[in-house]
Amino acid sequence: MLAVCVTVVLGLLSVSGSQAAPLTCEDLLRPLELSSTLGKWMYIAESSDRPFWEQILYTLLHSAWIEFYGIGIPHQNAFGFGCSRINSNFTLHDNSTWTSVSPIPVTEVLLTTCSDCLLTLEKWDEDGKTYTSLTLYSRRRELTATELDFYKKQVDCLSLPPATHMEGEHLYCSSQLVEDAGRSL
């Protein structure tokens, strides 16, 4: 009987010892290096403290994606009235922070997130106020509940309002369509 009790106690200790410690806000907001960000990323969710941002996104933006080329970031957006392309050049300050100047000056930091996701913490000034946004992108159109919960915790750490999520069934502008639209602007 003593052997059974010892086995049970040791078993419980090994299970409880193998559970990961809860992540702190410092862990959740750790900068990520820019090295593996080249390529296309689908817009998944965004949270911002800018007034009416959620309504703007929900009403106008149907889908979006960005593509990193190393020298610029074209943003592809599908609005209710069609597709558009915005090219942003950026200045890299270190391996995880950059500033873009178009269409408005924005400082962005890449943060830790799921393995095939990209998370940007953005800060910009508008009308004399500084605003913060946390935007989640992925190489996939849909994320797991665990991955979205991780993002929600990051939003909470920044005391931002709940995020606006793109629905997985929204269509994304094709690369050719956006290139054609970009030439016509």
Predicted region positions:
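A beta-rich soluble binding module of mature secreted/lumenal proteins
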Residues: 1-185
